[in-house]
Amino acid sequence: MAQRIFTLILLLCSTSAFAGLFDAPGRSQFVPADRAFVFDFQQNQHDLTLSWQVKEGYYLYRKQISITPTKADIAAVQLPAGVWHEDEFYGKSEIYRKRLNVPVTVNQAAAGATLTITYQGCADAGFCYPPETKTVPLSEVAAAIDATPTPAVTQTGETSKPAAQLPFSALWALLIGIGIAFTPCVLPMYPLISGIVLGGRQRLSTGRALLLAFIYVQGMALTYTALGLVVAAAGLQFQAALQHPYVLIGLAIVFTLLALSMFGLFTLQLPSSLQTRLTLMSNRQQGGSPGGVFVMGAIAGLICSPCTTAPLSAILLYIAQSGNMWLGGGTLYLYALGMGLPLMLVTVFGNRLLPKSGPWMAHVKTAFGFVILALPVFLLERIIGEAWGLRLWSLLGVAFFGWAFITSLQARRAWMRIVQIILLAAALISVRPLQDWAFGSPSAQAPAHLNFTAISTVDELNQALAQAKGKPVMLDFYADWCVACKEFEKYTFSDPRVQQVLGDTVLLQANVTANNAQDVALLKHLQVLGLPTILFFDAQGQEQPQARVTGFMDAATFSAHLHDRQP
């Protein structure tokens, strides 16, 4: 019996030792993408369900999920709302955990039809997988009678992105409308318009006067709302074209010209003949009657003064970018309501509530020119990138606050000195990105990052290993979509301790952001599951599996790891 027990213990120990052979330090703690995100699908005629089972401790990015049909037509795909995840480099992103089901309506599918599904995810421990692509074969489905054709490519993760990224909400239109009311082309006209609305009657009850003014404003709002709906509908039809770089540049130029008109460089307004005709039509209406006042307001909405043309055009272009019908109509309605509020006050309370006319009205008009200039910066930022976008915002901020400071110097009141100090401080803060760009930022004084040699194929890797001349080699895999890769660059590779240990090491880096065929081949050849992954080769060009790094390491941990791998 004792011999049997001894034999059993020896067997258990040998089993543990055998398992330990496969638990080497270089073994990745992360599972392959197919096990982290188990994908499946099920089709029942027109109804297709895509599903992912997400492993605990992993997540999928909502914006990285895309569906592309081939020889098939599908309805617009709506992804369910995810949970918010935030990191230092990419900010807030919607993600999915545990399980994701996406219903897809197949309007029509021919023989051999497929869906190409692309998705990408990461692990909470700081390990990201390259984009995964799956091909789903579709059963033949006859087109339904009420099926509506959809574009060939549906990028579901970005469905609402253009509208969501617009620079201001519709409520800003209300404030813009109120501001436009105090420009030199509009404010002096309110007493005259008030008299026309009341029909020349001076003794009307407050309620009656308020009602007539409100009806006039609603007539004006009707015209603007209709314009907003038409432009939003047109923008919806050409939404994809409106995101093309050439179109964005063209819109930015138009916005810049509109802003210059607010600065007084030239005048924008309807042809005088058309304005005269509309004015005559308005004069034929009977003031003091609800119907006549409503028509007056509707016609007034079509008569654009030099002060209102540029802001109105800017808002219309903003709406076209959104392609949102509700946003389009609501924005223009609030804009008209903002312009009409001072008129309602004048109609009820008289001229005593209006501020006195003066040069300040021209300053209001100029200020709106700077507001319009923010729109081309917003559009160009999509093309030129975040760094140059920040510099444009900086330039705009310096220009606006500098102009406001110089303008405020004309004031004589003591409290304006506080305003001047605030404006000057804002201008100095705004100039910082331009200063960093021109003279170098303080971060430039930080220790230099590692100097990598780029490789992209297996052949280039073998050639670099052959040219290492007996030196050890480190190969770092990097991608723009890998958060932990950026953390390695910022916190680990910049550390003097790490740089000192790697002083005699040949440094290679493979950028696999594109995830193209040669990237996939390199990853597969080296059995790399995801990023960040760092490989080490000895002086003979052989990989040291036990030294392989998967996942983020801070400078101290990575430095210790480098010391441990050294012979």
Curated annotation (Swiss-Prot):
Broad class of where this protein is predominantly found: membrane
TM regions (residue ranges): 170-192, 212-234, 246-268, 297-319, 326-348, 358-380, 387-409
Reactions listed under catalytic activity: [protein]-dithiol + NAD(+) = [protein]-disulfide + NADH + H(+); [protein]-dithiol + NADP(+) = [protein]-disulfide + NADPH + H(+)
Gene3D superfamilies given in the database record: Glutaredoxin, Thiol:disulfide interchange protein DsbD, N-terminal domain
Any one Gene Ontology molecular-function term assigned to this protein's record: electron transfer activity
Subcellular localization(s) per the UniProt record: Cell inner membrane
CDD domains: DsbDgamma
UniProt keyword GTP-binding, yes or no: no
One annotated GO biological process: cytochrome complex assembly
Alphabetized UniProt keyword annotations: Cell inner membrane, Cell membrane, Cytochrome c-type biogenesis, Disulfide bond, Electron transport, Membrane, NAD, Oxidoreductase, Redox-active center, Signal, Transmembrane, Transmembrane helix, Transport
InterPro entries in the cross-refs: Cyt_c_assmbl_TM_dom, DsbD_gamma, DsbDN, DsbDN_sf, Thiol_diS_interchange_DbsD, Thioredoxin-like_sf, Thioredoxin_CS, Thioredoxin_domain
EC number assigned by the record: 1.8.1.8
Range of residues in the leader sequence: 1-19
Disulfide bonds: 122-128, 185-307, 482-485
Membrane topology term: Multi-pass membrane protein
Cellular compartments per GO CC: plasma membrane
Residue span, Thioredoxin domain: 435-567
Family per similarity comment: Belongs to the thioredoxin family. DsbD subfamily.
Function of the protein: Required to facilitate the formation of correct disulfide bonds in some periplasmic proteins and for the assembly of the periplasmic c-type cytochromes. Acts by transferring electrons from cytoplasmic thioredoxin to the periplasm. This transfer involves a cascade of disulfide bond formation and reduction steps.
Protein name: Thiol:disulfide interchange protein DsbD
Biological source species: Salmonella typhi
Encoding gene (name): dsbD
